[in-house]
């Protein structure tokens, strides 16, 4: 009883420690044991059967795999299967030499059956069949798959920089998150490792084929010597027994080798899609009824040649004609269903009903209108990913800015060009562009080596030049240094840019209330004391909108509300309260504008001009003389151009009383300019004025 309880305890511990990890070491021990220890014929039959079953499983898995990386362990499995076959060859050779003189059954039933059944009693035929199998495996399948793996590894490595840049572009545009970027980079690394491993693993199979020929020769001559000299067998009898066993041994090892070589060829030649190999072959071979019809005609003509087996050709011709008719009928039914759907849709349009309040449509905060050819981008059944990219944009926006933007509504506009799209903010068109579904845009990155043979276009977001290219040109463009992105990414990047530019328009009272309700869950005491006892929702909304207008994130609601609680008792002006909140958020503002910069290069204001502006504001109720205004615009333009030349931030640093006023009047003409007060830059940063706006 004690022994049984100990045994069950060991089994339970194996379950807890993931027994799968023991398979590799155990398999290696078994293979080494087969090479060293003598095996009984029955055990040899078991291992030969296991080898055949393993090769069939590997082939079927490779056939049903949809993506290459789904079977990433294949190179390792190829190594183990090759070692297993070689170990079986060693073990079977030992058994044949030790027991071969007792008859063909002495080496096991599997070897004997392969020797008798496949050879058919003729040793010459057996040798020829064995040599043909080895030639097919060595010269055709293994050599071809090895070359494909070698070229695939080279192209995968060459394409890695381009793929990495595309991932970085999606990440910088906010189309993907950090986790998704890590997954894509890991996938690229795995692909390179896989094809590199396959390049080396194919050498195992070629070496196995060569070893099979040498082992066959050694077994035949070794068997003749042992049978004739040691066991006093007649030379003819020894040749009969040992040749049959050797050929049976060779065939039972080479057939699984041929199957696994075929699996290797399937793995490296397949194209990664959502279909397995069988589905790809059927869908692509039998997709065109005209091709099948022409094949039937050619086959029928060949069947009329005198001496041909007419019945067989006739059967295949009729079969192909039937298949062509069925495919053509299926295609016509699909077209007919589409026409019926269109007619039903038009009939519904023609039935006019009375107007009602249901016909009154409220304006969407954010709307994208797309042309007919871009509809597949939002069709989930056609693998359209634009909706997923928009969800990622909204989520990233909420995490970085601090509030959830409104939903994006997408509709088809039949009046647009088929490849065009428009983006609306509260019913006003703020952007438009052209996209081609199924194509990619190769954007100039500054590292490209040569232009592409396509019409040059401009990316709608930043005006970068590029080319619309087909999928089969994607790898070439990446190798030439272009950043290649898909069509849906162009629209998503454009949308993300426009949302950022109109962020204050999207933050209404409804969003302010939703944000306040969300903050109330975390800080109920702070919100209850402040709103509506000290300030109301209208003032809070105005303050937050002022911050968003100048692209200041409102994530840190704790600091914002605490600052308002401190100063809003005596101060009710939203603009003044906004200035105080900005000072409290100075670390966030500084980090956003000058990330990882110890010395910040900014635009300064000459003291005489600064004093002139202060005096002008005090005397004329926050207005400025036209001549002074014109001078300010000219000097600001010059300073901005200088900042651009030295690649410095376009930031103007002024005294606190001037900040709000200058930001308001300069923002309209210079939207890229950020105006800060001296209190909004943290003390840890060293300020260097690289441009001066002077009188």
From Swiss-Prot:
**A Gene Ontology term for the protein's cellular component:** plasma membrane
| Biological process terms in GO annotation | bacterial-type flagellum assembly; protein secretion
Its transmembrane ranges are 23-43, 44-64, 71-91, 121-141, 209-229, 247-267, 285-307, 311-328
Could you tell me the superkingdom of the organism this chain comes from?
Answer: Bacteria
Gene3D superfamilies in UniProt:
FHIPEP family, domain 1, FHIPEP family, domain 3, FHIPEP family, domain 4
Keywords, A to Z, come to:
Bacterial flagellum biogenesis, Bacterial flagellum protein export, Cell membrane, Membrane, Protein transport, Transmembrane, Transmembrane helix, Transport
Localization, per the record, is:
Cell membrane
InterPro entries noted in UniProt: FHIPEP_1 (IPR042194), FHIPEP_3 (IPR042193), FHIPEP_4 (IPR042196), FHIPEP_CS (IPR025505), FlhA (IPR006301), T3SS_FHIPEP (IPR001712)
What topology in the membrane does the UniProt record assign?
Answer: Multi-pass membrane protein
- Answer whether the UniProt record assigns the keyword Transmembrane helix to this protein: yes
Q: Which family does it belong to?
A: Belongs to the FHIPEP (flagella/HR/invasion proteins export pore) family.
Q: What does the function comment of this entry state?
A: Required for formation of the rod structure of the flagellar apparatus. Together with FliI and FliH, may constitute the export apparatus of flagellin.
Name the record gives this protein: Flagellar biosynthesis protein FlhA
Query: What's the source species for this entry?
Result: Buchnera aphidicola subsp. Schizaphis graminum (strain Sg)
């Amino acid at each position: 009883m004690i022994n049984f309880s100990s045994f069950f305890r060991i089994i339970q511990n194996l379950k807890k420690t993931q027994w799968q990890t023991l398979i590799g070491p155990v398999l290696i021990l078994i293979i080494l044991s087969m090479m060293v220890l003598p095996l009984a014929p029955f055990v040899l039959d078991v291992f030969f059967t296991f080898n055949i079953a393993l090769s069939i499983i590997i082939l079927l898995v490779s056939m049903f795999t949809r993506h290459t990386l789904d079977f990433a362990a294949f190179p390792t499995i190829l190594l183990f299967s090759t070692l297993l076959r070689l170990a079986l060859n060693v073990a079977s050779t030992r058994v044949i030499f030790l027991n071969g003189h007792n008859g063909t059954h002495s080496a096991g039933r599997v070897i004997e059956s392969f020797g008798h059944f496949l050879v058919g009693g003729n040793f010459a035929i057996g040798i020829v069949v064995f040599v043909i199998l080895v030639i097919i495996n060595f010269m055709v399948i293994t050599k071809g798959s090895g070359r494909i793996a070698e070229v695939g590894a080279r192209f995968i490595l060459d394409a890695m920089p381009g793929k990495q840049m595309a991932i970085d572009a999606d990440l910088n545009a906010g189309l993907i998150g950090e986790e998704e970027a890590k997954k894509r980079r890991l996938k690229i690394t795995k692909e390179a490792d896989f094809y590199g491993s396959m390049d080396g693993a194919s050498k195992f199979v070629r070496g196995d084929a060569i070893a099979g020929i040498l082992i066959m020769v050694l077994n035949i001559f070794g068997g003749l010597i042992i049978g004739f000299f040691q066991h006093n067998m007649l030379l003819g009898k020894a040749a009969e027994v040992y040749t049959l066993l050797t050929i049976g041994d060779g065939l039972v090892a080479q057939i699984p080798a041929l199957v696994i070589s075929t699996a290797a060829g399937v793995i490296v030649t397949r194209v990664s899609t959502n279909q397995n190999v069988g589905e790809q072959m059927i869908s692509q071979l039998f997709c065109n009824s005209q091709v099948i019809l022409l094949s039937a005609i050619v086959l029928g003509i060949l069947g009329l040649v005198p001496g041909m087996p007419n019945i067989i050709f006739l059967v295949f011709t009729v079969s192909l004609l039937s298949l062509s008719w069925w495919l053509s009928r299926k295609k016509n039914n699909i077209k007919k269903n589409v026409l019926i759907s269109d007619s039903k849709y038009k009939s519904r349009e023609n039935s006019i009903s009375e107007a009602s309040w249901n016909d009154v449509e409220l304006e969407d905060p954010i709307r994208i209108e797309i042309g007919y050819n871009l509809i597949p981008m939002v069709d989930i059944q056609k693998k359209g990913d634009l909706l997923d990219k928009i969800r990622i944009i909204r989520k990233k926006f909420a995490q970085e800015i601090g509030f959830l933007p409104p939903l994006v509504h997408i509709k088809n506009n039949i009046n647009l060009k088929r490849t065009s799209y428009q983006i609306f903010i509260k019913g006003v068109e703020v952007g438009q562009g052209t996209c081609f579904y199924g194509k990619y845009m190769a954007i100039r990155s500054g590292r490209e080596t040569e232009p592409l043979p396509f019409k040059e276009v401009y990316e709608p977001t930043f005006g970068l030049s590029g080319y619309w290219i087909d999928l089969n040109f994607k790898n070439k463009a990446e190798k030439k240094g272009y950043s290649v992105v898909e069509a849906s990414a162009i629209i998503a990047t454009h949308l993300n840019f426009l949302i950022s530019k109109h962020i204050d328009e999207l933050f209404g009272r409804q969003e302010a209330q939703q944000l306040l309700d969300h903050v109330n869950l975390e800080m109920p005491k702070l919100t209850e004391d402040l709103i509506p006892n000290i300030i109301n929702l209208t003032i809070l909304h105005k303050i937050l909108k002022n911050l968003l207008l100048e692209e200041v994130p409102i994530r840190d609601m704790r600091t914002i509300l605490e600052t308002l609680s401190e100063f809003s008792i005596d101060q009710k002006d939203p603009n003044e309260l906004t200035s105080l909140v900005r000072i409290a958020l100075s670390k966030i503002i500084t980090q956003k504008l000058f990330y990882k910069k110890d010395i910040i290069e900014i635009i300064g204001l000459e003291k005489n001009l600064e004093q002139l502006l202060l005096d002008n504001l005090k005397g004329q109720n926050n207005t400025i003389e036209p001549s002074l205004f014109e001078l300010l615009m000219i000097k600001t333009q010059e300073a901005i151009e200088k900042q651009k030349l030295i690649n410095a931030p376009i930031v103007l640093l002024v005294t606190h009383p001037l900040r709000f006023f200058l930001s308001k009047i300069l923002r309209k003409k210079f939207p890229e300019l950020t105006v800060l007060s001296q209190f909004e830059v943290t003390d840890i940063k060293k300020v260097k004025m690289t441009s001066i706006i002077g009188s």
